[in-house]
Amino acid sequence: MSMDNIVRIIEKSQLKEVPEFRPGDTVRVHVKVKEGDKERIQAYEGVVISIRGSGISKTFTVRRISAGGIGVERIFPLYAPTIDKIEVVRRGRVRRAKLYYLRDVKGKVKIKERK
């Protein structure tokens, strides 16, 4: 068995079930946050502006507008053990794979809903 096959087998065992989502979708990511000896789950909701990588190293970027109208982006590894679950809140219809133009737009941008 070659090293490449071994890596693929290990990657396959690490993968967990995640819902299918694309850039433009609004998702709610439940993240496990460890504070001292306690652990709690924090929800982070926003628009997926990019998905990159493949396999176990796949990541996605979620952007949301926090209090005061400041945009906050967070990059999540898709198969990280700190992610409890991912919910798709609404499906957006966009024509780009990377929605970096949303960084320059002030206020809330309306993304058309996908049926």
Swiss-Prot record:
The GO molecular function terms of this record are:
structural constituent of ribosome
**UniProt feature coiled coil, ranges:** none
Q: Which UniProt keywords apply?
A: Ribonucleoprotein, Ribosomal protein
Q: Among its keywords, does the record have Ribosomal protein? A: yes
A GO BP term, please?
A: translation
Q: What's an example GO cellular component term for this entry?
A: cytosolic large ribosomal subunit
Q: Which domain of life is it from?
A: Bacteria
Report if keyword Ribonucleoprotein is assigned.
Answer: yes
Q: Which Gene3D superfamilies would you find in this protein's record?
A: 2.30.30.790
**The protein's role, per its UniProt record:** This protein is located at the 30S-50S ribosomal subunit interface and may play a role in the structure and function of the aminoacyl-tRNA binding site.
Q: Which family does the record assign?
A: Belongs to the bacterial ribosomal protein bL19 family.
This chain's protein is named Large ribosomal subunit protein bL19
